[in-house]
Each structure stands twice: as C-alpha cells, then as structure tokens.
Amino acid sequence: NVPKTANDEGPMPKPLLCDPALLTRDLSGRRYVVTGANAGIGLVTAKQLALQGAHVVLACRRVAEAEARISEIVAEHPNAKLEARELDLGSLASVRRFAERVNADFDRLDGLVNNAGVMNTPKQTTADGFEMQIGVNHLGHFLLTELLLDLLKRSAPSRIVNVSSCFHDKAMGRDGDVKVDDLFYERRKYDGW
C-alpha cells in the first residue's frame, strides 16, 4: 500500500525512490520554499509538500504560470496552502529582494529546495554578467541559501535540498570535467552542455 503522491497525476516518472512513510508525514505548520516550482520536479515537490499540510512558496520567474499551477492544485485539494513569489535566479538583485521579503514575512522556514535550473542554453549571461547556467544553477542558489540561512537555523531542525542532475557525470559524451580555470567561457568556445 504505497501512499498516493503528487507524482501519480503528472508526466513525471513514477518510481518511488523514498521511504513511503515520508509521504504520509503530517507537515502542518511547516513552511517550505521551492525554487522553479511552476513545472517539473519543482512542481511535483511543491504539490507533495502541500498535500502533506505544509505551506509552500513557489519561487519562480514566471509568477503567472506558478499561480495557474496553484489554481489547478487548489481546485483539486482546497486545503492546499501555496503561494507564488517572484524569484529570478539570474539576477542577484532579484534573489536579494526575494530573500528580504521571506525574512520579513515569515518567522520560520523549515526547508529550502533549490530546484530551479537551466540547461543547454545558448550563450547568455545573467543580469550580473555570469554565464547563465553557472549563474542560475549555482551562484543564484548559493546566494539565496546564504540569505535564508539564519531563518533556516532558527527553524531547526530545517533542511536545505539541492536538486541536481546526472548530466554532470555524463556530459553528453564529453569528458565531464568542470573547467574551473574558465567557468565563464572567456578563453574557450561556449558549449551549453
């Protein structure tokens, strides 16, 4: 008897890779921030946390899209506590504004799920001049975590979850080594993979 999960209704793969008891824990009174929660793994994560009673902040660039997903979830689960807030991890100013609001509005934060990410983008830079994938997937989340860390510590036992991919290892047939001496492709041809 595996508990029903948010994953049972969407396009995501179905294998259950966690202890089923975790999916029935009462999370009432707890608060989570999930980045990139308007689609994919982030949306499934936000929905599952809400189904278990948590208040979930969907931290997304496209707030209207997140609000549409929230409406769909609440139509099916009227007691779900979800809200959308704007967060663009490609802008450190946006990260600072988001964290400032969270710190001002909430007295506790039980979990931060750093899920948002971009992959195989054309060569672009963030608002702050960093290569887009490094800026969004790493630097934006690093700053967000740093700015919410005191709130997370005060809410202990809290958690920080960093979602990643196996592509770091596979690199689509490439050697997979991170070129730390040229992270921003200043001396070599850009490769989105």
Write out the residue ranges for each language-model feature.
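Short, Lys/Arg-enriched N-terminal segments with co-localized hydrophobic residues
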Residues: N1-P11
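Rossmann-fold NAD(P)H-dependent dehydrogenase/reductase core
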Residues: P11-W193
